[in-house]
Amino acid sequence: MKVLGIESSCDETGVAVYDTELSGVPALRAHAVYSQIALHAEYGGVVPELASRDHVRKLLPLIRQTLGEAGLRIDELDGVAYTAGPGLVGALLVGAGVARSLAWALDVPAIGVHHMEGHLLAPLMEDDPPQAPFVALLVSGGHTQLVSVKALGSYQVLGETLDDAAGEAFDKTAKMMGLPYPGGPQLAALAETGTPGRYKFARPMTDRPGLDFSFSGLKTQVLLAWRSSDQSDTTRADIARGFEDAVVDTLAIKCLRALDAAGCDTLVVAGGVGANKRLRARLQEAAQRRGGRVCFPRPALCTDNGAMIAFAGALRLQAGEHADAAVHVTPRWDMAALPPLAAQESGVGNRE
């Protein structure tokens, strides 16, 4: 089954083709992402109306490009998957409208995919994919969640952020210290040159039971440290390192607690912050110490992309699901409300 995936939930236009007749890395026949960073940079954040208009401009050319790279004609597709939520309503409607129109014209099924389920399942596209049950850390600019995955499609949220998401905290902290948009990756790069331990910030909510997160207080700590400093380049790097270490430690501590609570030893990490080098190293070290395993998607599939939507959509289409002809999107959508996935013959992601 060859499935076209379309991602348009925010400021990336992503398109991919996933082929269920293949497995591992080769099953992703082609994927392409267009980022709107340059468009939104002068505003210091995403402008929803501009995002929607840019998706309109870029989506069809990107579909043609991706099909060409996959070596496929459009009439060789067997299904179309699109992000139906959560996200910016206008941006979601662009992708959903194009996907539904293509599916109708080609007489193939379409399926709306939960954006965060796409992220959660992205590591399953790699060689030697993780098998459920496992715990997933979904960590991005808009979400920070710990999810117990008993089987594919069966999700229980164990903990989540009470205020800022981790990626959002990275971006806002970077902006406080004068780094250009988007600040998160810039701050992480700057932290590489910082001196460890010169600035030590709190590890929020790790001194009490529970699996929820809070990063607003940490952000305030950093702001006060920055304002009272000499604001030199060296100090900026040292504060960035202290902030990143605090976030990474907090995420790692909560992940280990979640594994204990769920009674399993496999951790899946996905979302844009999952590409952070220090977070990857810290979680791999922690997993090795407890004799467990941590699984990440390749860095290119950590940020928003069409590949994860094509893959998640393919699994649900194979299970017999499909969307009706109407164009529906859900800007706010609880992943725990998703229907469980029927067991696949391939056994992808589920232990026997």
Curated annotation (Swiss-Prot):
Listed GO biological process terms: tRNA threonylcarbamoyladenosine modification
EC number: 2.3.1.234
InterPro entries from the UniProt entry: ATPase_NBD, Gcp-like_dom, KAE1/TsaD, Peptidase_M22_CS, TsaD
Sequence positions that bind substrate: 138-142, 171, 184, 276
UniProt keyword list: Acyltransferase, Cytoplasm, Iron, Metal-binding, Transferase, tRNA processing
Domain of life: Bacteria
Enzyme class: transferase
Catalytic activity: L-threonylcarbamoyladenylate + adenosine(37) in tRNA = N(6)-L-threonylcarbamoyladenosine(37) in tRNA + AMP + H(+)
GO function term, MF aspect, one: iron ion binding
Keyword Iron attributed: yes
Comment on bound cofactor: Binds 1 Fe(2+) ion per subunit.
Cellular compartments annotated: Cytoplasm
Pfam families: TsaD
One GO location term (cellular component): cytoplasm
Cofactor requirements of the protein: Fe(2+)
Principal subcellular localisation of the protein: cytoplasm
Record: residues binding Fe cation: 115, 119, 304
Keyword field contains Cytoplasm: yes
Annotated NCBIfam families: gcp_kae1, T6A_TsaD_YgjD
Family that this chain belongs to: Belongs to the KAE1 / TsaD family.
Function: Required for the formation of a threonylcarbamoyl group on adenosine at position 37 (t(6)A37) in tRNAs that read codons beginning with adenine. Is involved in the transfer of the threonylcarbamoyl moiety of threonylcarbamoyl-AMP (TC-AMP) to the N6 group of A37, together with TsaE and TsaB. TsaD likely plays a direct catalytic role in this reaction.
Protein known as: tRNA N6-adenosine threonylcarbamoyltransferase
Gene: tsaD
